[in-house]
Regions:
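Terminal amphipathic alpha-helical/low-complexity segments used for targeting or macromolecular assembly
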Residues: 91, 97-181
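Structural signal for interior beta-strand "rungs" in well-ordered beta-sheet cores
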Residues: 1-100
Length: 181
């Protein structure tokens, strides 16, 4: 769209990459070395710092900044004017200043056809794992350990893998939940 700026990668052999079927609305900026998946919607005035990864089908509200090295998971939804200074897990709804994990993005999952009867067990497991990670007394690392004690279907497995990477050394960590955990 109009007035979008995209910076190229900073070093030889690196890249700034934008996938297919994305919508970057007016006055968005992508910093160097950003990697965008497919089917992403970025509303007006989003400022993305360098080395940011945004997975497929994320929806990002307008007038916000995304800190460098942050990752935004697939099918996540970030509310407008949210301060995004930590990783946003897939399938989650984040909003606020500072940004906080609010809930699963159930509307986004439904819009992607992931609420069909044949996927009911997978959505139920995703909800249970999310509740274990964000609504129990466990810290994220302990919740991940407990979640991995059972066989995980693809959605819950992706959520856990994303969070395991997010809490690894040298990363910014996941967005905290409402209540500050």
């Amino acid at each position: 769209r109009e007035c979008v700026t995209i910076n190229r990668a900073t070093d030889e052999g690196e890249q700034t990459r934008i996938g297919d079927h994305n919508l970057l609305m007016a006055y968005c900026h992508l910093g160097h070395n950003c990697l965008l998946g497919n089917g992403i919607v970025m509303s007006n005035g989003i400022q993305v710092a360098g080395h940011v990864l945004i997975e497929d089908k994320a929806v990002i509200g307008g007038c916000l900044g995304i800190h460098q090295f942050v990752q935004i998971g697939g099918m996540a939804m970030v509310g407008g004017m949210t301060r995004v200074d930590r990783d946003v897990p897939p399938y989650c709804l984040v909003e606020g200043h500072p940004g906080r994990e609010r809930a699963l993005n159930r509307v986004g999952l439904r819009r992607r056809g992931l609420d069909r009867r044949d996927q009911g067990q997978e959505i139920k497991q995703l909800q249970d794992v999310w509740a274990l990670l964000y609504r129990s007394d466990h810290v994220i690392a302990e919740g991940l350990r407990l979640a991995r004690e059972q066989p995980l279907m693809p959605l819950a497995d992706h959520l856990c893998s994303f969070l395991e990477g997010s809490i690894s050394q040298g990363r910014r960590g996941p967005m905290p939940a409402v209540g500050g955990r």
